[in-house]
Curated annotation (Swiss-Prot):
The chain crosses the membrane at residues 18-38, 49-69, 92-112, 292-312. One of its GO terms (cellular component) is plasma membrane. Its main location: membrane. This is Putative sensor histidine kinase NtrY-like. Residues 385-596 form the Histidine kinase domain.
Length: 610
């Protein structure tokens, strides 16, 4: 269950789920709009369906809003340890929200205002008057034709009634007379019908067959009053039905055709007027529909802006948050902290990460150098005091021992034992003097006095001298050049090489195949001096601290030799690297930067001259 809860929590707040929810919100918003639009067009909105769609839209937007704004409101109302980054995150989200909300609100209000103006313009009173007058003109035209046809029907009926005795028994004359009346009075059709027999007694040439079955009974009954009655059996014609007075159940039907263009115009006018009034009655529905659309668009844009703001905020704030955390660690004294450069893009943030890491490394190195310098300074003071306090009694002890040895050695019976004791005193006194000398040398290491020399010649002489002193060690010297002009303090370089070679010799004590190799290689900007031996090497735990003051693995000495070497090398713009060889032994590499050394010598000369 806990794993399921964690999975659901991560999925609910994932970008994928939020994207799916946004897509669903857009789809349901479209369906809501479509349903309202179709219902409004048909004049019958399905209110239950619209309500369900609106509820679903509301739920989706609420869930989406909660998911998108949860972290924002949580950081806004509940302060946490990331207060600074939360403030920045809130500002960015608020900025994006306002950037979307303000234009959307302005556009929505403007659109609603102009929509109302447009609707008022569409349904202006003048337009209503024009449409109503058009309908009145059409109705007047039809009414006028009906009045004329009514008068014509009365006149024809009267003429036929006057000729009753001539026509009743003469169908041919009846037909001829009816055609004459139709032509004379511009009738499109004239028909005389017998109600009892349901037959046509006479009809004009262009009249179509018509029976009483097509005429409603109430119209026939109404026509019995001998007054014309309108028969609306054909929308393209105006017809009048009237009973002939002198005849028994005989009726006259006359009609005139209406021009098709006029009929089409009347139909179009009536249709437009009906649609106009229908839309006018639904102005409220149109305004509601567009208001809902504007609200949904505003909400959608706001949610999109918030989601975009959250994404952009995470992209910007998370790297800054890591920098803040790293800065807090640095403030608490941890100078080993680094921010992951591979987790950010190669943009300004990436540049900031790289600069931060470089700065922390530089601070760490400076702090380490400061500690070493402070330690060296402290030991320098100690060295001066110790040297002063020890040297004073050592000199008389040494002189007294030498005089005892010269004066009383012949008189002592146990001469060998006496000499042994005195030599032991002298030897240990010399050891103490050497230790004191190292103290003094380290404390008072003078500034280098730069002169030109042949570095190959200097180092070769040192190697040859050490070879004579240690004939049990196989010395070798290799170089890729025969001569190299080098500006340095020759005394200090001699001291460096002697110290390194002595250390190598001491590490070879007890070795059967002792060998020391010195290599010199040059390049365009650097010269490298490498000392290799096949001795014991350095203890792994001391490799990183071998050049620190008073670090040593020997019982004799105070461990300032390599510290002095490092100081001299650095004074000559060099770098000292110490490592163990895979095949056994140690390798010490000195690399001098020739360009930097040349600049330092120039500055040194200017300082001396000035």
């Amino acid at each position: 269950m806990p794993k399921l809860k964690i999975f659901l929590f991560k999925y609910l707040y994932s970008k994928r789920f939020i994207g799916i929810l946004v897509a669903i919100a857009i789809i349901f918003s479209y369906f809501t709009y479509y349903t309202i639009s179709i219902g409004t067009k048909n004049g019958a909105v399905n209110s239950s369906k619209v309500i369900w769609f609106l509820l679903i839209d509301l739920i989706i937007f609420l869930v989406l809003g909660i998911l998108l704004t949860r972290k924002f409101f949580q950081s806004f109302f509940f302060k946490n340890s990331d207060q600074n980054t939360s403030k920045l995150q809130n500002r960015i989200v608020v900025a994006f929200s306002l950037a979307a909300a303000i234009p959307t609100i302005i556009v929505s209000i403007s659109s609603a205002y102009f929509l109302n103006l447009s609707i008022q313009a569409w349904f202006d009173r003048k337009i209503s008057v024009v449409l109503d007058q058009s309908i009145m003109v059409a109705d007047s035209y039809i009414a006028e034709h009906k009045v004329l046809l009514r008068e014509t029907a009365l006149a024809v009926a009267e003429d036929l009634s006057d000729m009753y005795y001539d026509l009743i028994h003469n169908p041919a004359l009846f037909t001829k007379t009816l055609n004459t009346e139709a032509e004379m009075r511009s009738l499109d059709e004239a028909i005389v019908l017998n109600k009892s027999t349901n037959t046509i007694i006479a009809n004009s040439y262009l009249s179509f067959s018509l029976s009483f079955a097509t005429i409603p009974a109430h119209l026939i009954k109404k026509a019995d009053s001998c007054e014309p009655v309108e028969v609306k059996s054909d929308p393209t014609k105006i017809r009048m039905l009237i009973k002939l007075k002198e005849y028994n159940d005989v009726y006259l039907l006359v009609g005139r055709s209406i021009d098709n263009k006029i009929i089409d115009h009347i139909d179009a006018t009536n249709g437009a007027a009906a649609e106009y009034h229908r839309l006018k009655n639904q102005i409220g529905n149109i305004q509601i529909k567009f208001s809902i659309i504007f609200i949904f668009i505003a909400l959608l844009l706001l949610l999109i802006a918030i989601s975009f703001g959250v994404i952009v905020t995470a992209k910007i704030v998370n790297p800054i948050k890591k920098l803040v955390i790293a800065t807090d660690k640095v403030k608490s004294g941890d100078l080993t902290v680094q921010v992951p450069e591979n987790e950010v893009d190669k943009d300004e943030i990436g540049t900031l990460y790289a600069a931060f890491n470089r700065m922390i490394k530089q601070l760490s190195r400076q702090q380490r150098d400061l500690v070493i310098a402070q330690r060296a300074l402290a030991w320098s003071d100690v060295a001066k005091k110790v040297a002063h306090e020890i040297k004073n009694p050592l000199t008389p002890i040494l002189l007294a021992s030498e005089r005892l040895l010269k004066k009383f050695s012949p008189e002592i019976k146990e001469r060998a034992e006496f000499e042994n004791y005195l030599k032991m005193i002298i030897r240990h006194t010399n050891d103490i003097k050497n230790i004191v000398s190292e103290f003094v040398l380290f404390a008072r290491l003078p500034a280098p006095k730069f002169t030109n020399c042949d570095l190959i010649y200097v180092i070769n002489n040192i190697v040859e001298a050490r070879k004579l002193l240690n004939n049990n060690i196989l010395y070798s010297f290799e170089t890729n050049i025969d001569q190299f002009d080098f500006t340095c303090d020759t005394t200090q370089i001699n001291q460096v090489m002697i110290n390194l070679l002595k250390n190598a010799e001491e590490s070879l004590e007890g070795s059967n195949q002792a060998a020391i190799k010195v290599n010199i290689n040059t390049s365009e900007q650097f010269i490298n001096i490498t000392v290799l031996d096949n001795g014991r090497g350095f203890p792994p735990e001391l490799i990183g601290k071998a050049t620190e003051s008073y670090v040593t693995t020997r019982s004799k000495g105070m461990g300032v030799g390599l510290a002095i070497v490092k100081r001299i090398v650095e004074e000559h713009c060099g770098v000292l690297d110490i490592a163990n060889r895979e095949t056994g032994g140690a390798v010490i590499d000195i690399r001098f930067n020739l360009e930097e050394l040349k600049l330092k010598v120039k500055r040194h000369e200017i300082g001396v001259i000035s």
